[in-house]
Amino acid sequence: MRSSLVLFFVSAWTALASPIRREVSQDLFNQFNLFAQYSAAAYCGKNNDAPAGTNITCTGNACPEVEKADATFLYSFEDSGVGDVTGFLALDNTNKLIVLSFRGSRSIENWIGNLNFDLKEINDICSGCRGHDGFTSSWRSVADTLRQKVEDAVREHPDYRVVFTGHSLGGALATVAGADLRGNGYDIDVFSYGAPRVGNRAFAEFLTVQTGGTLYRITHTNDIVPRLPPREFGYSHSSPEYWIKSGTLVPVTRNDIVKIEGIDATGGNNQPNIPDIPAHLWYFGLIGTCL
């Protein structure tokens, strides 16, 4: 009897101490793949200065599912506002989507070298929250324009799903933008790939439970960028994390993705191993390489 009780409490403690892991459905896997391609398309220079109504295309087979859907541009922007925010707003009639895609940094090494760790209050998004100064300032500088563009698209297509997405810096911008516009009554899902931490623990907790859409935070093996800025500077990651455990240049399958729950959970990308830059460029294919 005593040994049974000991085993029970040990098992219970282990369950509490360890992050909860679950696999993803085939439908969600397909969405991860599609929005990774929308994120990849934002790196293609011609897609950031494209006339409205033209089709989204990519070099190097970076976005075949987007091309197959005959997605078109509603609006594109390049080097806008603070931090040279770049990307596009797209209409996908095949999948009934309105997609805002933010481009990531052109040079990962330079971005890491110039990364600042300053946090600023963002109480207009959530009480007690502090966000990365660069990410929040960049979003604020283009928010009015993009808010209006999204609003116009939703008015024209009220039954379409709204998705914000991006890789690296683009994922950080998509996360902040989604949190901000949900507060204005929009239903927005966010798919971020290899995104850095965007704020303090209060902000991470808010992102975890915020209504009006879902945040899908996807990471890959030991990608260096999701480990920045360091937790020692007051930063935290939201829950859950969808961690791709297969290696760089290895095709990703549904069984390679693990859903890990818990703010700042360990066992996914957040492990005590050597971080890797090439891992940052492989999310369901090469991402960030379209010119």
Swiss-Prot record:
Q: Carries keyword Disulfide bond?
A: yes
What is the residue range of the signal peptide feature? 1-17
- What would changing residue 111 to E/F/G/L do, according to UniProt? Altered chain length specificity
Q: Which InterPro entries match?
A: AB_hydrolase_fold, AB_hydrolase_lip/est, Fungal_lipase-type, Mono/diacylglycerol_lipase_N
One molecular function GO term is: triacylglycerol lipase activity
Top-rank taxon: Eukaryota
The protein's UniProt keywords, in alphabetical order, are: Cleavage on pair of basic residues, Disulfide bond, Hydrolase, Lipid degradation, Lipid metabolism, Signal, Zymogen
Protein name (record): Lipase
Provenance organism: Thermomyces lanuginosus (Humicola lanuginosa)
Q: Which gene encodes it?
A: LIP
